[in-house]
Curated annotation (Swiss-Prot):
HAMAP family xref list: NusG
One GO BP annotation of this record: transcription elongation-coupled chromatin remodeling
Chain ranges of the KOW domain: 131-161
UniProt-recorded name of the protein: Transcription termination/antitermination protein NusG
Annotated source species: Vibrio parahaemolyticus serotype O3:K6 (strain RIMD 2210633)
Pfam families, sorted: KOW (PF00467), NusG (PF02357)
Length: 182
């Protein structure tokens, strides 16, 4: 008895900005054609990012790989044609146009681990660095400017030196409590 072929991850190129629609259409095509046994997950890898706009903290999603959809599948002529028939799919990445190559298990694991981490805590869209001047927009030091002393991306916190009555006072703040000065 032969072992069933293993589902591998393939990268499908889609029109930029249509990744979500392509993933949804692909899922619908798989169901419509009754080919669920040939396909696993269909992913558009994204992470949640937090940014400050007009003093408001906003969450949005950022794609890891704009223009690409990850598809877990068993590659054969039927599955290849199904993916290629989905509107706004440009083709597979890797291998040849008629014989696509899957990404390695190591690459797939790295992407899946990154997705897992991204779902735990939203990352800041804005990156800070020591020496940069920021404006505090929340808390007791609101409307004060300060200089970034330290950045802790793990905890999403900054140590900012705020000048109060002519004296530099170190203050620990969350990323959402400050905004960059342009």
């Amino acid at each position: 008895m032969s072992e069933a072929p293993k589902k591998r991850w393939y990268v499908v190129q889609a029109f930029s900005g249509f990744e979500g629609r392509v993933a949804q259409s692909l899922r619908e095509h798989i169901k419509m054609h009754g080919m669920e046994e040939l396909f696993g997950e269909v992913l558009v890898p994204t992470e949640e990012v937090v940014e400050m706009r007009a003093g408001q903290r906003r969450k949005s999603e950022r794609k890891f790989f704009p223009g690409y959809v990850l598809v877990q599948m068993i590659m054969n002529d039927e599955s290849w044609h199904l993916v290629r028939s989905v509107p706004r799919v440009m083709g597979f990445i890797g291998g040849t146009s008629d014989r696509p190559a899957p990404i390695t298990d190591k690459e797939a694991d790295a992407i899946l681990n990154r997705l897992e981490k991204a779902s735990e805590a939203p990352r800041p869209r804005t990156m800070y660095e020591a020496g940069e001047v920021v404006r505090v927009n929340e808390g007791p030091f609101a409307d004060f400017n300060g200089t970034v002393e330290e950045v802790d991306y793990e905890k999403s916190r900054l140590k900012v030196s705020v000048s109060i009555f002519g004296r530099a006072t170190p203050v620990e703040l969350e990323f959402g409590q400050v905004e960059k000065l342009d």
